[in-house]
UniProtKB/Swiss-Prot annotation:
SUPFAM superfamilies: FtsH protease domain-like (SSF140990), P-loop containing nucleoside triphosphate hydrolases (SSF52540)
Top-level taxon of origin: Bacteria
Keywords, sorted A to Z: ATP-binding, Cell membrane, Hydrolase, Membrane, Metal-binding, Metalloprotease, Nucleotide-binding, Protease, Transmembrane, Transmembrane helix, Zinc
Protein name from the UniProt record: ATP-dependent zinc metalloprotease FtsH
GO terms (BP aspect): protein catabolic process; proteolysis
General function of this protein: Acts as a processive, ATP-dependent zinc metallopeptidase for both cytoplasmic and membrane proteins. Plays a role in the quality control of integral membrane proteins.
Similarity remark: In the central section; belongs to the AAA ATPase family.
Organism: Mycoplasma pneumoniae (strain ATCC 29342 / M129 / Subtype 1) (Mycoplasmoides pneumoniae)
Side of membrane Extracellular, spans: 47-171
Length: 709
């Protein structure tokens, strides 16, 4: 039975924040850049280079000397020529690594002894001006140019070393410093671009950054899903085979003059495989698959939604043939004119652009649009017309055969016990979607792993089904014996009424183990498969069964001791009764539908008069009261069976169909439950005896201590 639950939900929102991680990245990039620039400046900075004359030689009238540099890479290779221009002038031609020679001139001078002195001092080389000075002196004993050039070279050799600046490094450095502002600008632009991608979205994703505004967020992928991977849905898959054939052979349809399929919309309850079917179509056809959501088109800026629609279809045209899949299309394709956000609704702009792209002036050959929604009735009529979404395929909840197939698909790689019948599991899971069935198998696997077992048994499956229906068991919850017994009466009341009313359902399980907000629950399933049609007698039986819990409480404890545990039962019963009166024509008000069973009613619309509203309320109350009286009568006339169900629940906490049917048919406890009862009684006697002995021992100890004192 359910406990009252508040309806208030707290909502939280995250404010975008500047990511600290991005700030630190920018800081370290700047530090690294500064270090690199410093190293380059140190390497390329002009510096004095020490050179030494390595060897010299005379070739005819030309004297040459080779100079070896001592500064790493830069080697000065030759003093090419040393010749006398006149008796008074000596010219030395110097070149470095193939650079045009630099001419050095030394003028004749006379020292105090009358010797001719050629002073070549303070060698410095500037390649831009062509000037060079050699530090040292050359001495010429003779006063005329009489072939004694060798002496001049000897004099130069005797100088030993001289200093030559690396002027090429200066040129390289000038080029580097010229490019440095551009390099810094490019690096900072890249850093800003990377950080902006995260800053605008709070550092969370690329989808909300300032550089992606107006671009579609659809993901392009190749699908590996095939129809064979999907259990059930045979008719739905058959309908989609035409789309697959068109994507594979578009020319065949063009030659016959057939209009290519524009779109397919899949609608039905959540978890039934709509997205999986769309992926299977793309996988079977072997074409690209663009996946997006309806809400992914919208943004806080006006016009962004329409721009993203255009961008998506432009990309799809380039990748054609392909499939565009829009999940939850109702967020962008809802009926226009219901709620006006402004004079020109932003949402309507996006919808209008989508309508134009799907069937506008531009051709869209090779692009098939598939969409999924849980509510077809809220979509705009223009979106659903032929030429846009040509096919409307309903994806229903799987029947018993399809549930068995889905369970087999998900159990392929699981080690199930041989005692497990997937058909029985399918019978116990009516109304389950494919996603819920997958969750049942996964939960059972997790339970087996938790117990360090390599095989999944039926207990794991049972517990997994309970978890999916009502949540995990709250075995640690402290429940008094009185409350535990009250819950047992409540759930036994549901089961007892369900066993005695004329209904297509049968009771499968009763438990008083708390789960979620429920203190216990009773599981009923259809006797013969899944019926899409419900008779009036079935609906009345469902109401009576729902009221069985409150009827048992009032019958056993009285009207003043009833509890809030029946709130969810009343909710269920009231909804069924209201549908019978206002939609199904199963009341004294006649065959009239007062509330549309499909579509939505605009706010403020009045569908019936005040008197009719009173009549509807009266009929709903009359149906519920009649079925409540019926439930009270069943409980009164079958009190012994009720007590046996309660006793079995208090002993075993959970009883299954076999035990329930045994009690119903034989009006006594099943042998297994009886054996558990005897074990519990024996255990209680042993504990009572032990407690009595302990108490006696304590009294004897107290007497001995008093005697000694």
């Amino acid at each position: 039975m359910k406990k009252n639950k508040g309806l208030n939900e707290a909502t939280t929102s995250e404010k975008p924040q500047f990511p600290k991680r991005t700030a630190w990245k920018i800081f370290w990039w700047v530090v690294i850049l500064a270090i690199i620039i410093g190293i380059l400046v140190y390497i390329l900075m002009p510096r004095a280079t020490t050179a030494v004359i390595e060897k010299w030689e005379l070739s005819g009238t030309t004297l040459s000397a080779q100079i070896k540099g001592l500064s790493g890479k830069h080697t000065f290779q030759r003093i090419n020529n040393s010749t006398y221009v006149t008796d008074d002038i000596l010219q030395v031609s110097i070149s470095f690594q193939g650079i045009n020679p630099i001419v050095v001139t030394a003028h004749k001078a006379t020292n105090g002894s009358g010797e001719t002195i050629f002073n070549i001092a303070n060698l410095s080389i500037n390649q831009s001006t062509g000037k060079a000075i050699v530090n040292g002196m050359m001495t010429q004993d003779q006063k005329s140019n009489n072939g004694t050039e060798l002496a001049s070279i000897k004099g130069l050799h005797d100088i030993g070393t001289f200093v030559a600046p690396d002027t090429r490094a200066r040129d390289v450095l000038n080029i580097f410093f010229g490019l440095l502002p551009i390099i810094i600008f490019v690096i900072f632009f890249l850093l800003f671009w990377r950080s902006a991608r995260g800053i605008s979205g709070g550092g969370r994703s690329e989808e909300d950054n300032i550089f992606s505004i107006g671009k579609t967020q659809a993901k392009l992928a190749k699908s590996s899903v095939r129809f064979d991977n999907i259990a059930g849905l045979q008719e739905e898959k058959h309908e989609l085979l035409e789309i697959v054939d068109y994507l594979k052979n578009p020319l065949k349809y063009a030659q016959m003059g057939a209009r290519s399929p524009r779109g397919v919309i899949l609608y039905g309850p959540p978890g039934t495989g709509k997205t999986l079917l769309a992926k299977a179509v793309a996988g079977e056809a072997g074409v690209p698959f663009f996946q997006s959501t309806g809400s992914g088109f919208e943004d806080m800026l006006v016009g962004v939604g329409a721009k993203r629609v255009r961008d998506l279809f432009n990309k799809a045209k380039k990748a054609a043939p392909c499939i565009i899949f829009i999940d939850e299309i109702d967020s962008v394709g809802s009926k226009r004119g219901r709620v006006e956000l402004s004079s020109y609704s932003v949402v309507e702009q996006t919808l209008n652009q989508l309508l134009a792209e799907m069937d506008g002036f531009t051709s869209r050959t090779g692009v098939v649009v598939m969409a999924a929604t849980n509510r077809l009735d809220v979509l705009d009529d223009a979106l659903l017309r032929p030429g846009r979404f040509d096919r409307h395929i309903q994806i229903n909840l799987p029947d018993i055969k399809e549930r068995e197939g889905i369970l087999q698909v998900h159990a392929k790689n699981k080690n199930l016990s041989s005692k497990i019948s997937l058909l029985d599991v399918a019978k116990r899971t009516p109304g389950f979607s494919g996603a819920q069935l997958e969750n049942v198998i996964n939960e059972a696997t997790l339970l087996a792993v938790r117990d360090n077992r390599t095989t999944i048994n039926m207990n794991d499956i049972d517990e997994a089904i309970d978890r999916v229906i009502a949540g995990p068991a709250k075995k640690s919850r402290v429940v008094s014996d009185a409350d535990r017994k009250l819950v047992a009466y409540h759930e036994a009341g549901h089961a007892l009424v369900g066993l005695h009313v004329h209904s297509n359902d049968e009771v499968q399980k009763i438990t008083i183990i708390p789960r979620g907000q429920a203190g216990g629950y009773t599981l009923s399933t259809p006797k013969s498969g899944d019926l899409n049609l419900k008779r009036k007698s079935d609906l009345l039986a469902m109401i009576a069964t729902a009221m069985g819990g409150r009827a048992a409480e009032e019958e056993i404890y009285g009207p003043l001791e009833i509890t809030t545990g029946a709130s969810s039962d009343f909710y269920k019963a009231t909804n069924i009764a209201r549908a019978m009166v206002t939609q199904l024509g199963m009341s004294k008000l006649g065959q009239v539908q007062y509330v549309p069973s499909q579509g939505t009613v605009p706010p403020g619309t009045k569908l019936f008069s005040e008197q009719t509203a009173k009549d509807i309320d009266f009929e709903i109350n009359a149906i519920i009261e009649e079925q409540y009286k019926k439930a009270r009568t069943i409980i009164k006339t079958n009190r012994k069976e009720l007590e046996l169900l309660v006793e079995a629940l208090l002993i075993a906490e959970t009883i299954l169909k076999s035990d329930i049917d045994y009690i119903h048919e034989h009006t006594k406890l099943p042998p297994e439950i009886l054996a558990q009862k005897q074990e519990q009684q024996a255990k209680q006697k042993a504990e009572a005896k032990e407690a009595k002995l302990n108490k006696k021992t304590e009294k004897d100890t107290e007497k001995d201590s008093e005697t000694n004192s």
